[in-house]
C-alpha cells in the first residue's frame, strides 16, 4: 500500500574532492536496500560514508507495506577536508494520502556547488533524485 510512496536519492560526486554523508534519518517510513523495499537497512549503514570523486551513493526510502504512511527524512552532506563543515542539509517528504511531495535543500557553503534534478512534487512517489556535488577549486 505505502510502497507507492518512495524516493531514491543518488549522490554523485562530480568533483575532485571527497564529500561525506551524516545524520541520515528516516522519521517516517524506512530505508531499504537497492531494489528491495522489503529489505530494511539502518541509517548507520550510511553514517560517515565518503563519496569519492566520480563515485555515487544511493539512498532508498519508502513507506511501510500495509501501513498508511509515506516516507520523510533528512540528511547532511559535509566536507571531510574542512572539519565536517556542512555543505547542505536535505529534507524529503513523500506522504501517504497527500497530493504534494516536498524536496528541500538548505544551507550554504560557498566552496561547494550542488545541483539536483528528478524530484516529483506532485502526488505519488517523489521519484529518483540525482544530487551532483562539486567542490570548487582544489
UniProtKB/Swiss-Prot annotation:
Pfam families: Aegerolysin. This is Ostreolysin A6. The keyword Membrane does not apply. Gene3D superfamilies: 2.60.270.50. Belongs to the aegerolysin family. Coiled coil: none annotated. Disulfide bonds: none annotated. Monomer. Keywords: Cytolysis, Hemolysis. One of its GO terms (biological process) is symbiont-mediated hemolysis of host erythrocyte. Has hemolytic activity against bovine erythrocytes at nanomolar concentrations in vitro. Promotes active pleurotolysin B (PlyB)-dependent permeabilization of membranes rich in cholesterol and sphingomyelin. May play an important role in the initial phase of fungal fruiting.
Amino acid at each position: 500500500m505505502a510502497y507507492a510512496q518512495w524516493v531514491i536519492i543518488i549522490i554523485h560526486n562530480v568533483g575532485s574532492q571527497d564529500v561525506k554523508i551524516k545524520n541520515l534519518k528516516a522519521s517516517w517510513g524506512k530505508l531499504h536496500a537497492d531494489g528491495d523495499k522489503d529489505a530494511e537497512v539502518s541509517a548507520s549503514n550510511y553514517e560517515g560514508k565518503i563519496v569519492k570523486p566520480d563515485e555515487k551513493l544511493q539512498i532508498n526510502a519508502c513507506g511501510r507495506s500495509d501501513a498508511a504512511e509515506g516516507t520523510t527524512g533528512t540528511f547532511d552532506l559535509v566536507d571531510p577536508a574542512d572539519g565536517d563543515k556542512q555543505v547542505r542539509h536535505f529534507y524529503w517528504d513523500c506522504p501517504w494520502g497527500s497530493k504534494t511531495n516536498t524536496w528541500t535543500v538548505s544551507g550554504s557553503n560557498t566552496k561547494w556547488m550542488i545541483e539536483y534534478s528528478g524530484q516529483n512534487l506532485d502526488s505519488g512517489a517523489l521519484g529518483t533524485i540525482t544530487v551532483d556535488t562539486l567542490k570548487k577549486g582544489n
